[in-house]
């Protein structure tokens, strides 16, 4: 991994490889989690590893070892609340005893908290509300914030365009003709 980073990203001057979840996140100012792992084998995040004022950004899945900590001690922010409501309709799973299985997705945890009456809907902030000035961003220096970024399609369009521009710049790729004339033209 270190060789790959040095070859591909020479501007990165400081690399620390970690062998355990705690080592990677303990006392960090920012934790950015973007993992792709087997279901229910997610990285673990324990409250005692998180320092006051930490910003946690999750675009993947994680195992929060203390559900009550999520309910009581973190600021909950999502990119698109209705998207997580839809995720629950599609992806939520239950065990044979009728117990809800963890999804690993913070935004789904937040919707479940609201549905279960543990928090009010107003306790989950959407990024757009912050951008429009309807709600504050950080409320205090000690506030622990967890942002769930679940994959809005517009991000796929943006990344697709970036890939297209890079391929065009390098003269690689295959041009695909999707239509002779657009249908609604």
Residue ranges and their predicted role:
Residues 37-41, 49, 175-185:
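Charge-rich, low-complexity intrinsically disordered segments
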Residues 26-27, 38-55:
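Rossmann-fold NAD(P) dinucleotide-binding segment
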Residues 35-37, 60-61, 81:
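Short glycine-/small-residue-rich Rossmann-like dinucleotide-binding loops
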Residues 1-38:
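Glycine-rich phosphate/diphosphate-binding loop of Rossmann-like nucleotide-binding domains
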Residues 39-41, 64-65, 85-86:
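Short glycine-rich, flexible loops that bind phosphorylated cofactors or substrates
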Residues 67-183:
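Adenosine-phosphate binding glycine-rich loop
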Residues 32-33, 57-58, 78:
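Redox-cofactor binding/interface segments in oxidoreductases and associated redox assembly factors
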Residues 26, 51, 65-71:
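Short loop/helix-cap segments at secondary-structure boundaries that form the rim of catalytic
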């Amino acid at each position: 991994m270190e060789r790959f980073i040095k070859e591909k990203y020479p501007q990165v001057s400081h690399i620390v490889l970690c062998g355990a979840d705690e080592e990677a996140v303990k006392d960090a100012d920012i934790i950015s989690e973007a993992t792709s792992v087997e279901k229910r084998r997610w990285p673990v995040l324990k409250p005692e590893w998180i320092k006051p004022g930490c910003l946690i950004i999750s675009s993947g899945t994680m195992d929060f070892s203390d559900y009550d900590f999520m309910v009581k001690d973190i600021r909950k922010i999502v990119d698109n609340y209705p998207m997580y409501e839809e995720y629950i309709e599609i992806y939520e799973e239950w065990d044979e005893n009728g117990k809800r299985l963890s999804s690993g997705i913070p935004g789904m945890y937040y919707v479940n908290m609201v549905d279960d009456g543990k928090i009010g809907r107003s306790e989950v902030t959407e990024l757009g509300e912050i951008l429009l000035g309807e709600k504050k961003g950080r409320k205090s220096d000690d506030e622990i914030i967890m942002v769930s970024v679940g994959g809005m399609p517009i991000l796929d369009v943006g990344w697709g365009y970036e890939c297209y521009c890079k391929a065009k710049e390098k003269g690689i790729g295959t041009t695909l003709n999707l239509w002779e004339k657009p249908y609604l033209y």
